Amino acid sequence: MMNNNGNQVSNLSNALRQVNIGNRNSNTTTDQSNINFEFPSGVNSNNSVQNSNNGRNGTQNNNNENSIKDTIEQHRQQQQAFSDMSHVEYSRITKFFQEQPLEGYTLFSHRSAPNGFKVAIVLSELGFHYNTIFLDFNLGEHRAPEFVSVNPNARVPALIDHNMDNLSIWESGAILLHLVNKYYKETGNPLLWSDDLADQSQINAWLFFQTSGHAPMIGQALHFRYFHSQKIASAVERYTDEVRRVYGVVEMALAERREALVMELDTENAAAYSAGTTPMSQSRFFDYPVWLVGDKLTIADLAFVPWNNVVDRIGINVKIEFPEVYKWTKHMMRRPAVIKALRGE
């Protein structure tokens, strides 16, 4: 699809405009909507990972406010509509489990679930053949007994590896580790991973940091800002501050990687950078990509991508406050596999 500027927009962004993800049947931790991804230039004006548009007038702000009000009203209406928990229709899921594919992967996700798109990104980067089933929470498909047998937590994402006797894996971090380790075992190439135990430990550390500290804090900040039944300013402030703290950790790590890279590559100016007589930002290597672990992209980096594009809705401008995080995310957002996954293709 196309946005008003004629740029392509992902299926994820389209779904987030239409689907309320704050209702009690939702099993994502995002609790917000109206997030647009634009390609290939990056992320659109609703996101913090974007090019600044200082000429924007009040119309855009009013549209954003109206969008939030509409989403909150949807939340209220759907809570009413689903007070009757007998409203469950999951024949589509039952049929799938009766006729499962013989090979490849099946990803269970939701069109507004960042963690589901996190898995899709890695599947796409590794070149694995997979099919995505976007569950309909309104029909209660996530409560289908067959799906609960795959994920006892009845949440997304979940993955079935049909090449391993329909092995089911749940929790996004566990899924990513399964995929990169399987690829490494089958090909001998540690793509998005490492053959070095020390690097593997660091990748695991950042991955666990993302799944336990980054995503949940953003989800809570969004919940208390837009969907909690009472306005609790201290909760909004507490979770927003924690998100900033988390991004500060990532920013510092990337900045250290940036300094090391520039000093290694720009040897003719290294002394001037060390002495402080020339800003390191003037180096021709200053915008080169840097990664959290080693000198290549891994799942430690990619796990952050879908979540990095919602933080503007809690009042955090990544480009201004965390410039290294901004550049890092833009480098990943330009990758064809990431674009494909975020479009839901």
Curated annotation (Swiss-Prot):
Span of the signal peptide: none
Give a yes or no for keyword DNA-binding in this entry: no
**Descriptive protein name:** Protein URE2
InterPro entries assigned: Glutathione-S-Trfase_C-like, Glutathione-S-Trfase_C_sf, Glutathione_S-Trfase, Glutathione_S-Trfase_N, GST_C, Thioredoxin-like_sf, Ure2
The biased composition feature labelled Low complexity covers 41-66
Q: Which organism is it from?
A: Saccharomyces bayanus
In Gene Ontology terms, what is one molecular function of this protein?
Answer: transcription corepressor activity
Question: Is Transport among the key words of this record?
Answer: no
Q: Which residues does the UniProt record annotate as the domain GST C-terminal?
A: 196-345
Q: Which SUPFAM superfamilies match?
A: GST C-terminal domain-like (SSF47616), Thioredoxin-like (SSF52833)
